[in-house]
């Protein structure tokens, strides 16, 4: 084994050692012009089995190497790089620290990428391994979560929502045994969330890909930054509520660790891009030729969006609602198509009961209220099928401020009315539409209670939701530790945080508490009594006038909605029986 002495531009001595089981090789020093990384060209591929590092004595701060990343590549520009190891603990003073590498592929080029905000301050850097191409049997995965590693051409950093930067997009999963690595691009995404130091991204593969266990094979995917959500799970929990409340389509989402050009960015949520797709928003995708007759009627995908005026393809409705046209695409939509959907939206505003699908609107409403989401009507997706005048609502989206995470509405459960009626929680004229469609409609009230009742007797229970939160807390534990090393905000209020609880565990417990309280609050606000299933006895409470159950009678829910003329087939709940002037309360268990 021979030791290389490498002199950096900053005149700091760096020793780089490459050990080989048979041949003892030396490499050529390589580095970038900005001192972001240093490494070696080994001349030929080598399987790296161990790395070692030591901070310089001058650095004084041994934690400056924490979150530094080792990478291997077979292109000198590192576009095809894969992670070898990430440092998670402080180094020892004046001593080398070593770590085994669990990656079976051989690499010609190896490097160490300094953590964000630190100087390149290593006194010693060592690589161990053996010559060979290796194989693709296993790769390094940062935590139990999938690792998303993105490398851009010339290390360019995404800087806006318009310019797509050429990239290699890599996802390592299933404990390092599965690799997806394909060319694509990256740009920023989002609206207000782009203001945070931890940026949100949209990634796009050149060809459609099956990503992890997502239903859709697609090019476009999102990386949600969850910066103001210190549980890192609010969006995922809301998606779970969407599934349990029966929304036709709930976006796919899963937690991942993200690297960009070798720099650790934190824990993100990899999610569907909300778009027209057979496994996403499943409507007819229009072409520029769909300009008349049946073809002109759809499909359309729109977003009632407070930020619509920042988009290229948008309009303001007669009643003042800002609407972004998501599909047809802004670059291909025709004048006829734009005029048609604008006219149809205005008709919907004038007569929501004729045009809005109650089933999806009410389920969407319940998800927003159960989660206590201030932003529910700040951004609402809707879609229209071809040859159908109905406007459907969904999918749900954007829950960073939900579950008691907004100082403007905290504590949500202390409010007597629904969260959407809080000041500033609706864009445009949406509050009036929701009032008319939900609150003032007996038909909507009855259907909403039926939806709620079915969900409460399925898996929308306190026990199952708490179990889901517990599961997510365990799955996120390793990743959250690294995330809050990168972004030390647990003791700070960021965005609209009403409080800073100091730890991930305390933040999760706050969501767990809220979920329990909110279920009870919703039951009460909806006039609903949850009666567990599994008990067959019937108890009764009568008025002074008795009811003869052998004679005709009417059945009502406790909120006064008609429920038929027989107790047979009714779900467990409390009902009011009326026969002439006589009434009787029945509890079906």
PLM-predicted stretches and their roles:
Residues 1-4, 589:
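Positively charged n-region of N-terminal signal peptides that target proteins for export
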Residues 8-15:
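Bacterial N-terminal signal peptides
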Residues 22-82, 95-136:
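Aromatic, loop-rich ligand-recognition surfaces of beta-strand-rich domains
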Residues 133-177:
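N-terminal module-boundary/linker segments of secreted carbohydrate-active enzymes
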Residues 158, 182-184, 192, 196-197, ...:
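Middle-to-C-terminal accessory/interaction subdomains
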Residues 170-225:
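Conserved oxyanion/phosphate-binding beta-strand-loop segments in alpha/beta enzyme cores
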Residues 209-210, 225-226, 246-251, 263-366, ...:
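Internal "kinase-insert"/substrate-recognition segments embedded within catalytic cores
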Residues 534-589:
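C-terminal outer-membrane/trafficking sorting elements
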């Amino acid at each position: 084994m021979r030791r290389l002495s490498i002199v950096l531009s900053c005149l700091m001595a760096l020793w780089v050692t490459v050990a080989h089981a048979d041949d003892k090789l030396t490499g050529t020093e390589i580095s970038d012009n900005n001192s972001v990384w240093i490494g070696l060209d080994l001349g030929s591929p080598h399987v790296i089995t161990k790395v070692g590092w030591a901070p310089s004595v001058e650095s004084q701060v041994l934690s400056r190497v924490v979150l530094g990343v080792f990478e291997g590549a077979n292109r000198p520009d590192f576009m095809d790089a894969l992670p070898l190891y990430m440092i998670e603990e402080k180094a020892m003073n004046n001593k080398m620290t070593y770590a085994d590498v669990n990656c079976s592929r051989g690499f010609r080029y190896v490097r160490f990428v300094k953590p964000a905000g630190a100087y390149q301050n290593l006194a010693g850097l060592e690589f161990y391994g053996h010559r060979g191409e290796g194989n693709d049997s296993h790769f390094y995965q940062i935590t139990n979560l999938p690792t998303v590693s993105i490398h851009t051409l010339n290390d360019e950093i995404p800087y806006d929502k318009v310019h797509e930067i050429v990239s290699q997009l890599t996802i390592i999963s299933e404990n390092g045994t599965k690799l997806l690595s394909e060319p694509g691009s990256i740009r920023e995404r989002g609206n207000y969330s782009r203001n945070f130091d931890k940026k949100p991204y949209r990634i796009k593969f050149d060809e459609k890909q099956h990503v992890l266990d997502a239903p859709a094979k697609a090019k476009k995917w999102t990386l949600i930054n969850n910066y103001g959500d210190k549980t890192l799970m609010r969006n995922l929990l809301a998606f779970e509520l969407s599934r349990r409340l029966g929304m036709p389509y709930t976006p796919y989402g899963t937690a991942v660790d993200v690297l960009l050009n070798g720099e650790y960015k934190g824990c993100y949520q990899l999610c569907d891009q909300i778009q027209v797709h057979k496994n996403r928003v499943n409507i007819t995708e229009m072409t520029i030729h769909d300009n008349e007759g049946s073809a002109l009627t759809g499909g359309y995908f729109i977003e009632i969006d407070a930020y619509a005026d920042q988009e290229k393809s948008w309009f303001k409705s007669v009643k003042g609602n800002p609407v972004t046209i998501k599909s047809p695409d802004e670059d291909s939509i025709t004048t006829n198509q734009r005029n048609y959907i604008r006219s149809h939206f205005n008709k919907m505003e004038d007569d929501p009961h004729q045009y809005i699908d109650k089933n999806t609107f009410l389920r969407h409403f319940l998800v927003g209220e159960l989660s206590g989401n201030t932003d529910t009507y700040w951004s609402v997706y809707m879609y229209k099928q071809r040859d159908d005048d109905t406007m459907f609502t969904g999918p749900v989206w954007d829950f960073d401020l939900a579950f008691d995470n907004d100082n403007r509405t905290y504590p949500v459960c202390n409010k007597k009315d629904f969260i959407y009626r809080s000041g500033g929680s609706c864009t445009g004229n949406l509050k009036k539409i929701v009032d008319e469609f939900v609150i003032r409609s007996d038909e909507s009230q009855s259907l909403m209670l039926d939806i709620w009742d079915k969900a409460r007797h399925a898996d929308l229970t306190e026990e199952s939701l708490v179990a889901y939160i517990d599961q997510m807390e365990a799955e996120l534990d390793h990743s959250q530790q690294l995330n809050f090393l990168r972004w030390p905000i647990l003791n700070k209020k960021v965005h609209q945080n009403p409080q800073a609880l100091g730890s991930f565990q305390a933040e999760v417990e706050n969501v767990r508490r809220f979920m329990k309280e909110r279920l009870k609050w919703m039951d009460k606000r909806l006039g609903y009594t949850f009666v567990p299933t599994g008990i067959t006895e019937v108890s009764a409470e009568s008025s002074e006038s008795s009811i003869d159950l052998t004679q005709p009678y009417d059945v009502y829910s406790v909120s006064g909605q008609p429920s038929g003329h027989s107790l047979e087939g009714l779900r467990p709940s409390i009902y009011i029986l009326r026969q002439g002037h006589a009434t009787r309360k029945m509890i079906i268990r």
